[in-house]
From Swiss-Prot:
Keywords, comma-separated and alphabetical: Acetylation, Chromatin regulator, Cytoplasm, Methyltransferase, Nucleus, S-adenosyl-L-methionine, Transcription, Transcription regulation, Transferase
The protein's enzyme class: transferase
Alphabetized PROSITE patterns for the sequence: SAM_MT_PRMT
GO biological process, one term: peptidyl-arginine methylation, to asymmetrical-dimethyl arginine
Provenance organism: Arabidopsis thaliana (Mouse-ear cress)
Any Gene Ontology CC annotation: chloroplast
Enzyme active site: E260, E269
Primary localization: nucleus
Protein name per UniProt: Probable histone-arginine methyltransferase 1.4
Length: 528
């Protein structure tokens, strides 16, 4: 299929072209001509000085165009050919500057038309004209489309970016980790993986980065461009690229990767896989990763209030005469459903009944495939005699800078973050004595909805006389979906203690207060 516009060459005169990979070889003299052409059925974009034979060509099938401003774009290709030596390079990029917005628009229209035709040739056209690409990315292979759409829609909204920015523990720790390790950023090339609003990219630029590539797949990329453009002293060293890490190309290797890829239980949303893919694709040998290491912490807990609260949720389905209908056939399913939800909240660390243990995930060494299944053996020693209601989890990450090593934690008792903590509640608690050994397994299996299925087993080993013979006294298991948590952050936490309760930012209006407010409003309306 031949695009009519390429039956003859299309030429555009540019203000300037700067080669990112080799500034000394840039086409600096004016004018510079960009030409779309089709040579031996291969579509090319060629840059050449009008009075010289020097220039280079990009294969359009592997070329991407990124807008930096109204008159400025970055053109990146993973396969370019120099006219001088006819040798291909792995990746090359140029910054294009147009003379006016009319030329800019016409160039972009021609570029998109060529790319559209190339997609039709590589894929298959549906009846409604939609093109299905034959080159599905690795991200698309493992993540279902509906989940990805909702994920990118969520992070494409300023409301949710503001929620993360206002997590001052998170944002402040990142700022400190970067600024305290300026030597790792100064004069270096940085890639911000999942840049969001671009805040980490600007931190890197403030620390003296030579250039920052802010990669963001959601619509937030447009907001990031706007925010960065509003900080002109930083903007000249930051390029926002809209696309997935798995799909894009960069014109150079990175000295530093920076990202905020952590989800609930550290691994939720499966962004850590993208982080290590960026490491494998773009990070130079001996490059730095911020963060560097993550740890999942775990400890058994006792919380009778939480257990009763969850069990009571299913009591609705024990009604035998609900408007003449017997609901009890669904009671067991409802009970199982409530206990299949991990609980996300901030809890009192005094609920923990054994010293915690942790599982290390080294982002510099972990492979993408190792995130598909994470198996953690558990072993604790009970410090009190109690009923264990489940396993509490939280995480921390290390920024291993050359100057300062800084930890960021979501532990109970530490300043609360928007991640809170997470608890897996057993539908059948187990009884333990002080000093009794608790064993088990936490098994995480990744699924295509960008999350994990959690399989938890806890067992209490025999204690006292005869314990040396081994054996298990009690065992309880549960299966949970990390994608569907129970967000309990605003629920009142009642604990028997003589200490004054901690201050809360949540405001609870009781029903009596509501009735009084309604009466006052009615009286006010009557007086008007």
């Amino acid at each position: 299929m031949e695009i009519p516009s390429l039956n003859k060459q299309q030429e555009f005169t540019l203000a300037s072209v700067t080669d990112l990979t080799s500034p000394s070889s840039s086409l600096s003299s004016s004018p510079v001509v960009a030409t779309f052409s089709c040579v031996n059925e291969v579509k090319e974009l060629r840059f050449q000085e009008s009075k010289s034979s020097d220039g280079f060509s990009f294969d359009l099938s592997s070329t991407q165009l990124f807008k930096l401003g109204p008159l400025q774009f970055t053109c990146v290709s993973d396969g370019s050919i120099s006219s001088a030596k006819e040798k291909s390079s792995f990746s090359r990029g140029v910054v294009i500057k147009f003379r006016d917005e009319k030329d800019s628009k016409e160039f972009c229209d021609s570029f998109e038309e060529c790319k559209k035709d190339d997609a039709v040739k590589q894929g298959s056209a549906l009846p409604n004209g939609t093109v299905v690409s034959a080159n599905k990315s690795k991200f698309d292979d493992k993540i279902e489309a509906a989940s990805a759409k909702m994920y990118f829609h969520y992070y494409g909204q300023l409301l949710h970016q503001q929620n993360m920015l206002q997590d001052y523990v998170r944002t402040g720790t990142y700022h400190a980790a970067v600024m305290e390790n300026r030597s790792d950023f100064s004069g270096r090339v940085v890639v911000d993986v999942g840049a969001g609003s671009g805040i980490l990219s600007m931190f890197a630029a403030l620390a003296g980065a030579k250039h920052v590539y802010a990669v963001e797949a959601s619509e937030m990329a447009e907001y990031a461009r706007k925010l960065i453009a509003g900080n002109p002293l930083l903007a000249e060293r930051i390029t926002v690229i809209k696309g997935k890490i798995e799909d894009i190309e960069l014109p150079e290797k990175a000295d530093v990767l920076i990202s905020e890829p952590m989800g609930t239980l550290l691994v939720n949303e499966r962004m850590l896989e993208t982080y290590v893919i960026a490491r494998d694709r773009f990070l130079s040998p001996n490059g730095k990763m911020f963060p560097t290491v993550g740890r999942i912490h775990m400890a058994p807990f006792a919380d009778e209030f939480l257990f009763v609260e969850m069990a009571n949720k299913a009591l609705f389905w024990q009604q035998q005469n609900y408007y003449g209908v017997d609901l009890t056939p669904l009671y067991v399913s409802a009970h199982q459903g409530y206990f299949s939800q991990p609980v996300v909240d901030a809890f009192d660390p005094r609920l923990l009944v054994a010293p915690s243990m942790f599982h290390v995930i080294d982002f510099t060494m972990m492979t993408e495939e190792q995130f598909y299944e994470i198996d953690i053996p558990l072993k604790f020693t009970a410090s009190v005699c109690t009923r264990i209601h489940g396993l509490a989890c939280w995480f921390d990450v290390l920024f291993d800078g050359s100057t300062v090593q800084r930890w960021f934690t979501t532990a109970p008792g530490a300043p609360t973050t928007h991640w809170y903590q997470i608890r897996c509640v057993l539908s059948q608690p187990i009884h333990v004595m002080a000093g009794q050994e608790i064993t088990g397994r936490l098994h995480l299996i990744a699924h295509s909805a960008q999350s994990y299925t959690i399989n938890l087993t806890l067992s209490a080993k025999m204690w006292g006389p005869g314990a040396n013979q081994g054996g298990i006294l009690q065992t309880s298991s549960c299966k949970l979906d990390l994608k569907e948590p129970y967000y309990r952050m605003s629920q009142p936490q009642v604990y028997p203690t003589q200490e004054p309760p901690a201050q809360s930012q949540d405001i609870h209006i009781h029903s009596d207060d509501l009735e009084e407010l309604e009466l006052l409003q009615q009286n006010a309306n009557a007086q008007l």
